[in-house]
Amino acid sequence: MSHPYESFMREAAELAERGRWSAAPNPTVGAVLVRDGVVVARGWHTAYGKSHAEVECLKDAEAKGVDPSACTLVVTLEPCNHQGQTPPCTEAVIAAGIRHVVIGLRDPNPKAAGGMECLAEAGVEVEAGVCEELCRDLVADFLIWQTTKRPYVMLKLAMTLDGRIATRTGHSRWITGETARHQVHELRANVGRAGGAILVGGNTLHTDNPLLTARLDDPVERQPLAVSISSRVPAPDSLLLFKERPTETIFFTTASGAATPRAAQLRERGV
C-alpha cells in the first residue's frame, strides 16, 4: 500500500532534479508544501551557498500568501540541523509553525544530520522513508562521498553490437551518432558545473588525441577537470590536451615517467 504523501514526494523529487548539477557539492533536494491534498508551494536547492529547498519552499509560500503552519512539508532529504553556508533548515521549519514533516531520506552527513530529532523535540510530527529509494537515487553521488570518500563514477562507452571499438588493425570511426555526441557534450558541461572531471586512459589519450572539453553552441559555464593516466609521457606539443590546455589538467604516470624531461615540461605548462 502506497503512502498518502508518495505522489507529493515524487513531485519534490522532480523539483530536486532541477538542481542536480548546480547544487554540488551539496546534495540536490526538493520540497513541497501540501494543504488539503494540494501542493501550494514549491522549492529546490538551486546552487551551493544559496537557500536550501525547505527555505525556498517557504519563500514561495510567503510570495503566494500561503500560511505554512496549516501545511505538511514534504522534502526529499532530512532538513539540515547545522550552521553552514546557510542557517539550519530545522530552525526555519519550526519558526514557520509547520507541525508535520514527511522526509524521503535521512541525511548521511553527520555534520548536517539530526534534523528529525530536532523537529520531533519541537513537537513536529515527523515521518521518514517515503519513496526512500527514489530519494536515495537523487543523491547517489553525495551518498558515495559521505560513506566511502570516493568519487561518483559514470562510464561513457560507445561500441559496436559485437562489442568492438576499433578493428584489429586499430582503425576506428565514429560509432555514435550526432544526437548521442551532443548528449555527451551536455553531460560534460554538467559534470563541469558540478566540479567534476573526465578521466581517460593512455590508449584513448594517444590514439584519439582528445580535448576532453564540453563543446556546445552556448558558452559553457565551467569546463570539467581533464584527467589522464598513461605510462607513456607525451611530448607537450604532441597532444591537444597539453598543447592547447583548454581546461585544468592532471596527468598520472609511473614514478619513472614522472622523472623524465617530458614530465618536467608538462609541469612547466601547469599540468
Report residues per predicted region:
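Short helix-terminating capping/connector loops at secondary-structure junctions
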Residues: A24-N26, V66-A70, E221
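Active-site ligand-binding patch in enzyme domains
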Residues: I144, M154-V271
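Zn2+-dependent cytidine deaminase-like catalytic core
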Residues: L33-L134, L225, R245, I250-G257
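Flexible, polar/acidic helix-loop-strand segments at domain edges
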Residues: V139-Y152
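Short, small/polar residue-rich loop motifs at catalytic or cofactor-binding pockets
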Residues: P25-T28, Y152-V153
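Short beta-strand scaffold segments in enzyme catalytic cores
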Residues: V29-G37, L157-A158
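Short, basic/aromatic recognition patches
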Residues: P4-A24, F142-W145
